[in-house]
């Protein structure tokens, strides 16, 4: 599965709407970088966040998830408490081609501050805004900047399309917008 280069990403974004909105050059001055890079695309985090709280002494249960576990915040920055976690989503909406799998990695700027980003792979023919899991592994509050880079997506093209895509399975996170909480 080769990693796809900038010109392929640009062509897919412009001609097929793979990334919308698409930033054709990497923005770097005074911000955490975002936009097209040599072999990937650095996505931005939107300005609405769900921050974990334990006010009600809740238990996190992926099979019986309660939105009471979160405090909603909207703004140009998000402060994640020490050793805590937040959910956010990309500004960009992705439409993944049938023969492509997308892997996400965190930005080194955040990782060097103890802020870890996790996103599961974007499967063939999945589309939507990407829900991003952000962990603050430090004993200090951590600041996340909305509308700036949060993670990098790498596009891997398979040798052939899969027999069954995410769209074929009618996946539960298809066409999500905003932050999507766990679903069964």
Curated annotation (Swiss-Prot):
Superkingdom of the source species: Bacteria
Active site, UniProt feature: 133
Catalysed reactions, semicolon-separated: dCTP + H2O + H(+) = dUTP + NH4(+)
InterPro entries: dCTP_deaminase, dUTPase-like_sf, dUTPase_trimeric
Residues given in the record as dCTP binding sites: 107-112, 152, 166, 176
UniProt similarity note: Belongs to the dCTP deaminase family.
Protein name listed in UniProt: dCTP deaminase
Lineage: Bacteria, Pseudomonadati, Pseudomonadota, Alphaproteobacteria, Acetobacterales
Gene field: dcd
